[in-house]
């Protein structure tokens, strides 16, 4: 009895903050900022997917006719022809779909004179992302693009970190690993881009984490913390829905995954389950209202040149490259920056290894949740292609963190997923090396074009920003920053601190 009282006293006694832990938090925070800056600098304006469209839409959202003039003429359904600043005109993407051509061609495009033709959003995407980013739009396009990329990065990382902090302490290490193994390279690239897909992915992932925590929350938590949790959960949904209409579908999938993982069928969770059901319905309604079926095609057009049966057959064969393309199987940029083979090899090793460890002792609830997410991940691209359209890996990226997170998390009453030091080191090291290779290739593609090789990015530079660190320094800082982030995740995985199991109440509320 005395031993039990002593143990209880230790649990209740406020814990002193370890100075080393506080220092690690500061170092990791700095590393995340540096990492975002490196990826923001890695590509020029126009380097992100459909950047001419998204940047024109942002500047047009300012309402300033001096930087954007609408014509009322449709280029295609819900895409309007507009006149924009010369720096946003056709020369912005002069290197698109030409991997051997550097971004130096932008200097040859006119930067003076009247407005130039482009295309902008007219209902194809929700307008929230463009209106928000237009707050940072100025006539200095290069500077504005960098500011917007850092804003996108900060918003994405902030959503993920806040959601992560609300999670049960026992889940934080698995969740950190889930993000590490599913968001490289495409996720981090999009977070620091002018494409709305980045913040949409972060919003969906943050919603899934907070939805799971919400279902686990018990009566011992304070009202303030409950409201804060719900606020973060709704923020993730709103950010995702105002960025992409198809995000509503993924919100619904994330709701189902969280509900199944937490055992939402239990009587005690029925009220909270209704909240998730309502959010899922809102998400589906948003997707249907946005008629996002036209959006899937993106820049790739339709498959009208192929017979429907042949297209579906090819889509089935290509499911891995579409579903897992975000891990390096697919190119970055405007689908014109192929990744080195080592990126896909190491990321598939890390993703598959973590997934297998997570399902080694899976419960029925976990298997059901995994089946739901993976079923959508496999079936969705086939269904979309069968409708005569195409799917890029970034459209399916929101499901990867949810899938990996579902595999790695456990209910409070179940044994947590454990990682040995060797396993953790192998997984983290693989991702760190893959990230370094992906960042190097991305910078190389725009500095000289991929027809030139070698480790030194500072040799024979054809394009770079007018100020700031050079291409080689940017890569070194970005690679080092990510290595620090990887070290933080490794420390979480091997910390060995066990959380007492005490029912289903989430300690994040205490």
Regions found by a protein language model. Give the residues of each.
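Start-transfer (signal-anchor) and selected internal transmembrane alpha helices
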Residues: 1-37, 272-279, 425-428, 481-510
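Perimembrane helix-loop-helix junctions
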Residues: 210-227, 248-280
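Transmembrane helical bundles and short interhelical boundary loops of multi-pass, membrane-embedded
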Residues: 261-262, 267, 282-285, 294-309, ...
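Membrane-interface helix-loop-helix junctions at transmembrane boundaries of multi-pass membrane enzymes
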Residues: 168-171, 224-227, 265-273, 352-373, ...
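Membrane-lumen/periplasm interface segments of multi-pass, membrane-embedded glycan/lipid transferases
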Residues: 268-277, 285-359, 458-479
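Interfacial juxtamembrane loops and adjacent helix segments
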Residues: 63-142
């Amino acid at each position: 009895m005395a031993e039990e009282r002593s143990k209880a006293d230790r649990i209740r006694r406020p814990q002193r903050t370890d100075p080393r832990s506080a220092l690690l938090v500061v170092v990791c925070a700095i590393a995340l900022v540096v990492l975002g800056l490196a990826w923001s600098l890695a590509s020029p304006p126009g380097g992100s997917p459909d950047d001419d469209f998204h940047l024109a839409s942002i500047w047009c959202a300012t309402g300033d006719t001096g930087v954007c003039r609408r014509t009322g003429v449709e280029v295609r359904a819900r895409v309007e022809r507009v006149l924009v600043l010369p720096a946003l005109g056709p020369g912005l993407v002069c290197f698109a779909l030409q991997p051997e051509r550097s971004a130096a061609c932008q200097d040859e495009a006119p930067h003076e004179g009247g407005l130039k033709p482009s295309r902008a959003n007219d209902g194809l995407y929700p307008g929230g992302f463009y209106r928000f980013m237009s707050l940072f739009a100025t006539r200095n396009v290069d500077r504005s693009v960098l500011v917007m990329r850092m804003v996108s990065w900060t918003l994405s990382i902030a959503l993920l970190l806040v959601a992560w902090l609300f999670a049960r302490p026992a889940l934080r290490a698995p969740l950190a690993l889930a993000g590490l193994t599913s968001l490289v390279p495409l996720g981090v690239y999009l977070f620091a881009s002018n494409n709305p897909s980045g913040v949409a992915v972060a919003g969906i992932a943050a919603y899934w984490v907070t939805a799971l925590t919400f279902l686990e929350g018990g009566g011992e938590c304070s009202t303030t913390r409950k409201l804060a949790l719900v606020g973060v959960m709704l923020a993730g949904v709103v950010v995702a829905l105002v960025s992409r209409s198809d995000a509503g579908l993924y919100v619904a999938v994330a709701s189902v995954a969280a509900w199944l993982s937490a055992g939402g069928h239990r009587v005690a969770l029925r009220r909270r389950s209704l909240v998730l059901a309502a959010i899922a319905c809102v998400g589906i309604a948003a997707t249907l209202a946005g008629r996002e079926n036209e959006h899937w095609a993106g820049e790739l057009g339709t498959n009208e040149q192929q017979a429907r049966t042949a297209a579906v057959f090819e889509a089935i064969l290509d499911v891995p490259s579409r579903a897992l393309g975000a891990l390096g199987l697919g190119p970055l940029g405007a689908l014109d920056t192929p990744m080195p083979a080592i990126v896909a090899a190491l990321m598939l090793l890390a993703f598959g290894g973590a997934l297998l460890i997570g399902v080694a002792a899976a419960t029925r609830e976990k298997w059901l949740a995994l089946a739901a997410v993976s079923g959508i991940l496999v079936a969705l691209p086939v269904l979309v292609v069968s409708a005569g359209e195409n799917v890029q890996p970034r459209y399916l990226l929101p499901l990867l963190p949810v899938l990996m997170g579902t595999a790695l998390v456990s209910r409070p009453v179940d044994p947590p997923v454990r990682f040995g030091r060797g396993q953790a080191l192998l997984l983290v090291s693989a991702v760190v090396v893959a990230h370094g290779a992906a960042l190097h290739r991305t910078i190389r593609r725009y500095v000289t074009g991929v027809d030139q090789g070698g480790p030194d990015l500072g040799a024979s530079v054809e394009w770079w920003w007018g100020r700031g660190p050079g291409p080689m320094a940017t890569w070194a800082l970005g690679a080092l920053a990510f290595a620090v982030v990887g070290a933080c995740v490794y420390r979480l995985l091997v910390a060995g601190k066990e959380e007492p199991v005490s029912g289903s109440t989430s300690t994040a509320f205490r």
